[in-house]
Structures are given as structure tokens and as C-alpha cells.
Amino acid sequence: MIWHVQNENFILDSTRIFMKAFHLLLFHGSFIFPECILIFGLILLLMIDSTSDQKDRPWFYFISSTSLVMSITALLFRWKEEPIISFSGNFQTNNFNEIFQFLILLCSTLCIPLSVEYIECTEMAITEFLLFVLTATLGGMFLCGANDLITIFVAPECFSLCSYLLSGYTKRDVRSNEATTKYLLMGGASSSILVHGFSWLYGLSGGEIELQEIVNGLINTQMYNSPGISIALISITVGIGFKLSPAPFHQWTPDVYEGSPTPVVAFLSVTSKVAASASATRIFDIPFYFSSNEWHLLLEILAILSMILGNLIAITQTSMKRMLAYSSIGQIGYVIIGIIVGDSNDGYASMITYMLFYISMNLGTFARIVSFGLRTGTDNIRDYAGLYTKDPFLALSLALCLLSLGGLPPLAGFFGKLHLFWCGWQAGLYFLVSIGLLTSVVSIYYYLKIIKLLMTGRNQEITPHVRNYRRSPLRSNNSIEWSMTVCVIASTIPGISMNPILAIAQDTLF
């Protein structure tokens, strides 16, 4: 009898929860329509996987890519609509959030074709891989629009859990297991520190969780200049720092880059930074409005350490992926300049523009690494020597992406850095910009060192890996080539494209 009563209560409680969720989706679903498209794509993937065999693998790629493209289309149709706060204040929709969501969707759309050949060659499980990628994308999108502390914590955890699973996807690889373990342990520790900072904000504001209400609560309780705010600021900076991976919170980055499957590294290298940057701008700009001098100082220290350590250590690396890991640490230092400047001197606009270029430069480079690695089985920089003699197209495209990452004119990376540094200079960040300029010169050195290896024509310097290198017989139909071509074109866009891109970015400012 007791069991029947408990069972009935469980069914009633479950029904109430389901009806509440359905009610929220019915009345607020239009505000998260791009996210709903991805959720539908996830459900469709699971249904097809449970009812079909491995011969339907092309459908998995098609469904994933189509759902991402449709989500991008939904975002574009919603452009310039009035800002809306939905789900009882948990989620905010505005142009600023949507531009970051667009960047995350763009990353995922380019990463899926980049992964096709790798998955087929390594015989990885395709459905789970795509499910993790789409779920991580979904978590990143919700993080961009998060408007309260709970959503800001849950959304990145959704992204992080999928990231842990993706980084350890090749479970028979010892390096992958090591990378996943370090990633998981440090991620769990950083999440705990982040929640600790949120608890201070919650208590000091009188029990508020919405970002704007926290500011009002701090004013009402007169706690906006209390020592507790400093503790909250430091804790939250450490928590977000793990996601952005600036120095000294970068310890996980080189190992995860080296041990994880290369398409996974390509995905994580850009999406995590875009989502974390979107979250950082809102958290620092709204709840810590009265502590702007303090968080500016903290971010300046992180930017300087990242630009110096990232670029100097990258010079000494022999692995291509580890070199890009330290390079990405230096790159996030440049992005932090835009966060510090804020919207007063087009800091956010320049940051968004540079991140758009960084996506194309970084994914283009990783597309070349995937292609070369599948045909040679090596990641050592020395093994790229003489690649131009065997595959000029691959060598030239890799060289263009590396030069753009270094910021050489007239490539897109140069104009992105130029505008970012100019905004920093106008805001009075003279020392920070000077460090950025010097470290950019350092980065050009190690990029040019790789390009010199690519273009060498002396037989004694050509490695056995390149001598035995075979070009893809299906080059025109190769999905990696498609993704790489898009990235290379975007990386070499001349400066004439800067004005319309900046104008769009400036329209997003909240």
C-alpha cells in the first residue's frame, strides 16, 4: 500500500515538472528558438542512431550541420530586435549575446566537416561525438545569454562535461587519458572556486541572483565596497580564468591540446574562449560595476602574463599542437585588452572582430594539422620540413593562416590586432599595448620558423614523413578541404572588410 502511494506521488510530481517545463517552452520558446533547433537536432540524432545501422553515417553529419546552419539563420532573422528577458529573468536576448552565439555556432559548423575524415580514419563512434559537440554548443549558447548566477554556473558545466568527454574520446591513448584527468580535476576545482565567488555575491546583495538585481541589492545593503566583494571578484576571476586559460591558469591547456583528438582541440580552442569571453564581459561589467579599477588591474596582470609567457614558451615547443596551445594563451591576452577597454572606446567591438578573425585563423591551421596528421601520423614540427614539394596547396594555406595569426599585413589578423591595440591605446593602456606589440613580434618569429620548414627545398632536410606523404585522391570532395578553404579565405580578407565588420560589432553593444 505504501509503495503504491509513493509511486502515485512520484508520477504526480513528475507530471507537474513536465507540465511546468512544457508551459515554459510554450510561452518562452520563441526567445530560445535557435537553441530549440539544436535540441531538436540532438533528439533526431538519437532517434536515427537507435533505428539505423552504420550505413547511415552521412545522415548524422547532415543532421548536425543542418541544425547548426538553421540555428544561425534563426539568429540572423532575429537580429536588431528589442532586448528581451525571459524565463523569469534567467535568460536575456539581445544583439550583444547573439553575436557571441553566432560565433559559437560558426565554430561548430566549421568543426564538423573538419572532423569527418578523422573520425572515419580512426573509427571513432560518430553519434556520440556529434552529440557531445552539439550539447557543448548548446551550453555555450545558453552561457552567452545567461542573466543569473545559476544559469551562469549550469551552462558552462554543460559545456565543460562535454569537453571532458571529447578530450578523452580516444580512451586507448595514454596521453588522452592523462589530458582528460588533468582537465577534469582542474575544471572541477575551478568550478568550486567560481561557485564560492557567486555565494559571496548572493549573500552580499541580500539574496539576489539576477545580475542587475545584484547591483541594486549591493546598493541597498551598502556592501558594494566591502572586503567580501574583493573575495568574490578574485574567486570569480579564477573560475573564469580556467575557461579562458590565460596565464597562470593555463596549466591544463598544453596537455589537453597535445593529448586530445585534433578536431576536438580545434573545437575547444575557439568555442571555450568565445563563451567565456561573453560571460566575462557581463559579469565584470554589471555586478562588479563599482569595482572596475580592481578587476581592470586583475585582468591587466593576466593579459601581461599571458602575452609574455604564452609567446616565449611557444618558441621552445617541438609539437605543433603544443605550440598552438601556448600561442592561444598569448592570443587570449590580446582579447583581454578588449574586455578591459569595454564599450567606451570600441573595446568590445574590436574584441568581437578579432575573435571572428581568430576563429578563421585558428580553425584553418588546425584543418591543415588534421590533414597532415592523418597522412603522416606525426605532430612534430620538424616533420613538416619540405611539405611544399609534396603538397603546395596544404603548405601555402597553412603558411597564410600562421602569418595571419602572427599579425602580418595585409592579412586579417593584422587589421584585427591593429584595431584592438588602437582601442587600448586610446583608453590609456599604453604599457599593455606596448607588451602586446612586442609579443606579437615574438610570435611572428616562431610562425616564420615553421613556414621556413614548410618551404625548404633541400632533399637532406625533407623528412621521411613528407617523402612518403600522399595527397588525398578526393581533394575536391574532402570535407576538411572545404572547411579549410573557408577559413583561409576569411583569414586573408583585406582591410577593406574591417569597416562593415566593425559597424556590425558596434551595433551589438548593450
From Swiss-Prot:
Record GO biological process: ATP synthesis coupled electron transport; photosynthesis, light reaction
Record flagged with keyword Nucleotidyltransferase: no
- Its domain of life? Eukaryota
Which InterPro entries does this entry report, sorted A to Z?
A: NADH-Q_OxRdtase_suN/2, ND/Mrp_TM, Ndh2_N
Q: Which residues cross the membrane?
A: 24-44, 59-79, 99-119, 124-144, 149-169, 184-204, 229-249, 295-315, 323-343, 347-367, 395-415, 418-438
The principal localisation class reads: plastid
The chemistry this enzyme catalyses reads:
a plastoquinone + NADH + (n+1) H(+)(in) = a plastoquinol + NAD(+) + n H(+)(out); a plastoquinone + NADPH + (n+1) H(+)(in) = a plastoquinol + NADP(+) + n H(+)(out)
Task: Cite the GO molecular-function annotations of the record.
Answer: NADH dehydrogenase (ubiquinone) activity; quinone binding
Q: Name one Pfam family in it.
A: Proton_antipo_M
Q: Which GO terms describe its cellular component?
A: chloroplast thylakoid membrane
List where in the cell it is found: Plastid, Chloroplast thylakoid membrane
Q: What is its EC number?
A: 7.1.1.-
**How does the entry describe its membrane topology?**
Multi-pass membrane protein
UniProt entry keywords in alphabetical sequence = Chloroplast, Membrane, NAD, NADP, Plastid, Plastoquinone, Quinone, Thylakoid, Translocase, Transmembrane, Transmembrane helix, Transport
Q: Which family does it belong to?
A: Belongs to the complex I subunit 2 family.
Tell me the function of this protein.
NDH shuttles electrons from NAD(P)H:plastoquinone, via FMN and iron-sulfur (Fe-S) centers, to quinones in the photosynthetic chain and possibly in a chloroplast respiratory chain. The immediate electron acceptor for the enzyme in this species is believed to be plastoquinone. Couples the redox reaction to proton translocation, and thus conserves the redox energy in a proton gradient.
UniProt xrefs under NCBIfam families: NDH_I_N, PRK02504.1
Self-association state and partner proteins as the record states: NDH is composed of at least 16 different subunits, 5 of which are encoded in the nucleus.
Under what name is this protein listed? NAD(P)H-quinone oxidoreductase subunit 2, chloroplastic
The species this protein was found in: Muilla maritima (Sea muilla)
